[in-house]
Amino acid sequence: MAILRSREIRDMSLEERADELENLNSELVRERALTSAGGAPENPGRIGEIRRTIARIKTIQHELNEI
């Protein structure tokens, strides 16, 4: 899943943002489960990228009074 930039997130509809947020949260859970099970993630920086993208989406939702 590609990391989204602020402009891309703003261009999404309300439902698309909510779906993307749900997908990113589930991906974050999978990555953390892999790490906690003792496995080495394919891309160690991916967890940070996912967290930052989630924060971007939530920030924009807050700015647009969607939360």
Swiss-Prot record:
Pfam families: Ribosomal_L29 (PF00831). One of its GO terms (molecular function) is structural constituent of ribosome. This is Large ribosomal subunit protein uL29. The keyword Protein transport does not apply. Keywords: Ribonucleoprotein, Ribosomal protein. Belongs to the universal ribosomal protein uL29 family. The gene is rpl29. One of its GO terms (cellular component) is ribonucleoprotein complex. One of its GO terms (biological process) is translation. HAMAP family: Ribosomal_uL29. InterPro entries: Ribosomal_uL29 (IPR001854), Ribosomal_uL29_CS (IPR018254), Ribosomal_uL29_sf (IPR036049).
